[in-house]
C-alpha cells in the first residue's frame, strides 16, 4: 500500500473525500514524466502523484463526464458490501448518465 497525493478539487479527491488515497500498488510500468506538460496542454489532468518517487498514479480528463485512470489497484481492496471510492463513483456516474 502506498500513499498517493491527490490534487485538490480533482474528481478523485472528491470521490475519496481526501487529499490522499491509500491503495495497493504493483508497478511494472511508469508514466514518463517528460510527456507530462504536452498531455496537460491538451486537457489531461495528473491528479494523483506518489510524491516519494514522483510517479503519476491517477489521471483524469475533466472535459468528460467520468474518466479516471489509476496505476494503483482498487480492485484488490474493494468488497461487494464496501466498494472502493473509484468503483462507487464510477457506478454512480453510470446511473446518473442513464437518467
Swiss-Prot record:
Matches recorded under PROSITE patterns: GATASE_TYPE_1 (PS51273)
Domain of life: Bacteria
EC number(s) given by UniProt: 6.3.4.2
Family matches, as InterPro entries: Class_I_gatase-like, CTP_synthase, GATASE
Regulation: Allosterically activated by GTP, when glutamine is the substrate; GTP has no effect on the reaction when ammonia is the substrate. The allosteric effector GTP functions by stabilizing the protein conformation that binds the tetrahedral intermediate(s) formed during glutamine hydrolysis. Inhibited by the product CTP, via allosteric rather than competitive inhibition.
GO terms of molecular function: ATP binding; CTP synthase activity; glutaminase activity; identical protein binding; metal ion binding
Disulfide bonds: none
Reactions catalysed: UTP + L-glutamine + ATP + H2O = CTP + L-glutamate + ADP + phosphate + 2 H(+); L-glutamine + H2O = L-glutamate + NH4(+); UTP + NH4(+) + ATP = CTP + ADP + phosphate + 2 H(+)
Annotated GO biological process: 'de novo' CTP biosynthetic process; pyrimidine nucleobase biosynthetic process
Entry keywords, A to Z: ATP-binding, Glutamine amidotransferase, Ligase, Magnesium, Metal-binding, Nucleotide-binding, Pyrimidine biosynthesis
A UniProt-annotated Pfam family: GATase
Membership in a protein family: Belongs to the CTP synthase family.
Function: Catalyzes the ATP-dependent amination of UTP to CTP with either L-glutamine or ammonia as the source of nitrogen. Regulates intracellular CTP levels through interactions with the four ribonucleotide triphosphates.
General remark: CTPSs have evolved a hybrid strategy for distinguishing between UTP and CTP. The overlapping regions of the product feedback inhibitory and substrate sites recognize a common feature in both compounds, the triphosphate moiety. To differentiate isosteric substrate and product pyrimidine rings, an additional pocket far from the expected kinase/ligase catalytic site, specifically recognizes the cytosine and ribose portions of the product inhibitor.
Subunit structure, interactors included: Homotetramer.
Name of this chain's protein: CTP synthase
